[in-house]
């Protein structure tokens, strides 16, 4: 009985194991189909167990070698033609011209030398959602709020992708040659595709006169795309014909306040300055985000390229202004960037409100790590080093306000000043000179390092006009002091003053003595520099009086007369001579027998003294006799007396 039960139980267990095995085999296809990029090992086709998960082929490798060819040329209009957006597809029959640095010489292009670059793993911290609509929403919010949008750490990712190998000399030279190539089509050899509808193209619209150009390179598998941005190069930089549009973009993006507050030679492109070294930041940002600016044109150009190559790995490169725009575009979408002699772009990156990872100040984008941007340049280039803004610099004389000094990402600097003894000059900024004299000459690539300890526009103060701006109130206190007013009426004006009689009276009153001083001057013979008449001064000096119930002052006159023997330009240079007497005044009688050549008399003066008599009993003064001289003969229009007669007056 027990043995039969054991046999029955063993049979049930065997049936259950067989059923479980069949069930697992039946469910095996559904389990395999739920996994991506896996396959079953053929050697274990009869096995019910899953094989190892092996990725399928076709995924881009992080390292490799790429051979690039020119595929498209994009042109995005900005100022003259803001609606222009067209594409030229390069085909075997398309004939292109390479434009020289001065914009005058053109030659047919033959693509004999391949453009080869290698890739290496590169880690970039970027947004997880990089769709154009999402990025535009962040930028619009930054413009309305006046600062970058604060995002959570979950919205950022650390991606390791295939990036340009910046330690390989051949790869760096390839990117430099991409930025140096400036191609235009031979008329009639290519068909332009107008992205926003058919454009009424006019022959007067020059290829190099407006807009941002993008040269699109692709490798043989279309897995890696290189966009080389090239702005219209100013004549001061690359020798091409400069336009006003370049100064507008340069001074708007790379100046502290749109070319204001500095040299009068700078072209001012906005009116955002409020006072000395104080500006409205909201006003500047609004001007930078206009649709006819290079940054907005670069976003449109990039979005159209990614529509054509949605699954490709995109790299960016550029020179000078194009390099700065490439760097801003790379910071916006998290793309690898290689630039050459780029204008320092940390200042516009902070003002545009580009999203910044947590833990980094969005106002200091130069402090960000893992940006994937590498800026190659040398120390003799004032644009790259941020020193082309002095009073005597060529940039200033050309009207360019290049005040920014800080780069984002990594700086790879060739020290040509120390190694080669170069002088800092704007001629070393040209990309052709950089390729032939720097990149091809140096055997090793310089080390790259971030530029963290760098600050732009430290002397300036910026405020926002959305209601949070600071207000400064100053109070001025005015103190009014008494003002003394003197009124004079001149009846006989002269060359150096008034020739009227001047009378000054000073009266001092005391209980016993009263003093009165009277000076009277009457000019009968005016000269060029004053009166030439003898000076007579009468002074009245009070003497002690007999005091009764009412004090009565008694004065006795003293008369003095002086004659000038050595007249000067502005007065008499003789020592003063005065004869005084208590009861009578001496009188001086002079008759000029030897007049001077121009003026004055050279005779010696004779002084007569009257005898002393007793004082009068009455309290009044006795006048002294005076003498009057009459000129009988004069020369030089009556200015000089030659002969005179004297008459005594009582």
UniProtKB/Swiss-Prot annotation:
GO terms for molecular function: phospholipase activity; triacylglycerol lipase activity. Keywords: Autophagy, Endosome, Glycoprotein, Hydrolase, Lipid degradation, Lipid metabolism, Membrane, Signal-anchor, Transmembrane, Transmembrane helix. The chain crosses the membrane at residues 12-32. One of its GO terms (cellular component) is multivesicular body membrane. The active site is at 320 (charge relay system). Glycans are attached at residues 165, 200, 222, 280, 304, 466. Signal peptide: none annotated. It catalyses: a triacylglycerol + H2O = a diacylglycerol + a fatty acid + H(+). Gene3D superfamilies: alpha/beta hydrolase. It is found in: Endosome, Multivesicular body membrane; Prevacuolar compartment membrane. Residues 33-650 are lumenal. It is a single-pass type II membrane protein. One of its GO terms (biological process) is multivesicular body membrane disassembly. Binds to both phosphatidylinositol (PI) and phosphatidylinositol 3,5-bisphosphate (PIP2). PANTHER family: LIPASE ATG15-RELATED. Belongs to the AB hydrolase superfamily. Lipase family. Lipase which is essential for lysis of subvacuolar cytoplasm to vacuole targeted bodies and intravacuolar autophagic bodies. Involved in the lysis of intravacuolar multivesicular body (MVB) vesicles. The intravacuolar membrane disintegration by atg15 is critical to life span extension. This is Putative lipase atg15. It comes from Aspergillus fumigatus (strain ATCC MYA-4609 / CBS 101355 / FGSC A1100 / Af293). The lineage of its organism: Eukaryota, Fungi, Dikarya, Ascomycota, Pezizomycotina.
């Amino acid at each position: 009985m027990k043995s039969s039960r054991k046999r029955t139980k063993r049979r049930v267990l065997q049936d259950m194991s067989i059923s479980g095995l069949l069930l697992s085999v039946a469910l095996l296809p559904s389990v395999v189909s739920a996994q991506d990029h896996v396959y079953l090992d053929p050697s274990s086709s009869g096995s019910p167990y899953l094989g190892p998960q092996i990725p399928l082929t076709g995924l881009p490798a992080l390292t490799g070698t790429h051979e690039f060819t020119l595929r498209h040329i994009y042109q995005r209009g900005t100022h003259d033609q803001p609606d222009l957006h067209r594409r030229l597809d390069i085909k075997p029959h398309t004939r292109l011209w390479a434009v020289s640095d001065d914009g005058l010489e053109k030659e047919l292009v033959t693509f004999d030398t391949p453009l080869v670059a290698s890739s290496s793993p590169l880690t970039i911290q970027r947004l997880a959602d990089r769709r154009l609509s999402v990025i535009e929403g962040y930028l619009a919010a930054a413009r309305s709020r006046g600062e970058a949008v604060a995002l959570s750490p979950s919205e950022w990712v650390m991606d390791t992708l295939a990036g340009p190998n910046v330690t390989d000399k051949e790869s760096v030279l390839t990117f430099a040659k991409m930025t140096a190539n400036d191609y235009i089509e031979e008329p009639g050899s290519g068909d332009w595709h107008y992205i926003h509808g058919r454009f009424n193209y006019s022959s007067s619209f020059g290829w190099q006169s407006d807009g941002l150009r993008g040269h699109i390179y692709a490798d043989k598998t279309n897995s890696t795309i290189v966009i080389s941005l090239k702005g219209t190069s100013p004549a001061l930089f690359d020798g091409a014909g400069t336009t006003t549009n370049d100064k507008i973009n340069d001074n708007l993006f790379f100046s502290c306040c749109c070319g204001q507050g500095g040299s009068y030679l700078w072209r001012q492109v906005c009116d955002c300055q409020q006072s000395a070294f104080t500006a409205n930041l909201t006003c500047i940002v609004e001007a930078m985000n206009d649709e006819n600016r290079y940054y907005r044109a670069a976003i449109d150009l990039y979005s159209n390229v990614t529509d054509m190559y949605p699954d490709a790995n995109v790299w960016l490169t550029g020179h000078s202004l194009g390099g700065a725009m490439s760097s801003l575009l790379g910071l916006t979408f998290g793309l690898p960037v290689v630039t050459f002699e780029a204008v320092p772009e940390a200042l516009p990156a902070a003002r545009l409100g580009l999203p910044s990872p947590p833990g980094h100040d969005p106002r200091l984008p130069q402090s960000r790590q893992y940006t994937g941007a590498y800026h190659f340049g040398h120390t003799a280039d004032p644009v790259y080093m941020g020193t082309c803004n002095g009073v005597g610099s060529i940039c200033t004389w050309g009207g360019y306000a290049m005040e920014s000094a800080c780069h984002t990402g990594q700086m790879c600097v060739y020290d040509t000043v120390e190694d080669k003894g170069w002088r800092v000059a704007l001629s070393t900024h040209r990309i052709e000179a950089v390729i032939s004299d720097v990149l091809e000459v140096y055997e090793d690539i310089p080390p790259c390092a971030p530029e963290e300890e760098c600050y732009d526009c430290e002397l300036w103060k910026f405020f926002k006009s959305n209601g949070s701006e600071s207000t400064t109130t100053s109070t001025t206190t005015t103190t009014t002091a008494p003002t003394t007013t003197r009124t004079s009426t001149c009846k006989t004006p002269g060359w150096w003053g008034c020739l009227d009689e001047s009378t000054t009276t000073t009266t001092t009153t005391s209980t016993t003595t009263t003093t009165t001083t009277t000076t009277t001057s009457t000019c009968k013979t005016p000269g060029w520099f004053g009166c030439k008449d003898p000076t007579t001064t009468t002074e009245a000096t009070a003497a002690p009086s007999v005091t009764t119930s009412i004090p009565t002052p008694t004065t006795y006159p003293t008369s003095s007369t002086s004659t000038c023997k050595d007249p000067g330009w502005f007065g008499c240079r003789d020592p003063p001579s005065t004869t005084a007497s208590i009861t009578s005044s001496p009188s001086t009688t002079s008759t000029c027998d030897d007049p001077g050549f121009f003026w004055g008399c050279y005779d010696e003066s004779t002084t007569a003294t009257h005898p002393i008599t007793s004082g009068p009993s009455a309290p009044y003064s006795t006048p002294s006799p005076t003498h009057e001289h009459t000129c009988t003969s004069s020369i030089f229009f009556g200015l000089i007396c030659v002969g005179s007669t004297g008459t005594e007056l009582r």
